[in-house]
């Protein structure tokens, strides 16, 4: 067995969330997030030759929420509470959804045909304050705070959206059931 490190250990690197499609169908490219001088950015890592290509710029890039489309032609990602579709070749992007003021969006899930995305939106003023005890402690505090969360269903082609479910409960990890875009799986977080 041969184990090969893919990233430079001096650079903080994340892979995408485990249910996100982070590799191309042919296994050539892997989506990663790295924190370098310009902050956190998304990159494609060529698994055949090790070449790393930066594909985003600016602040507020979601560190683990990007994913390839089923046909590998589009990369979906989040930046500053906006959700984008990027052409994987040209890197041309367009925003198809923006989270409303006062809310933060996260945990995207895609339909099998990449037509629909589900996300969790959390009302920011219902979250506990970040007092420096970040990390896993924040999970327990967030669960106890019972923040106002909602699951939003977005049509990627038109940008139209609607709230599917809203409650004072911490939601996470939305996934649209394969081949059934009318069923959304999600997590009620906690207790921690």
Enumerate the predicted regions with their spans:
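Residue-level recognition of a conserved intra-blade site in WD40 beta-propeller repeats
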Residues: 23, 68, 110, 176-178
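Residue position within the beta-strands of beta-propeller blades
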Residues: 28-33, 75-78, 116-120, 182-189
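Asp-box/WD-like beta-propeller blade repeats and closely related beta-sheet repeat scaffolds
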Residues: 58-150, 159-166
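A short helix->beta-strand "capping" segment at the edge of beta-propeller domains
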Residues: 1-15
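Conserved loop/turn motif of beta-propeller repeat scaffolds
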Residues: 26-27, 39, 72, 113-114, ...
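Beta-propeller domains
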Residues: 163-192
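Blade-loop segments of beta-propeller domains
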Residues: 12-20, 37-83
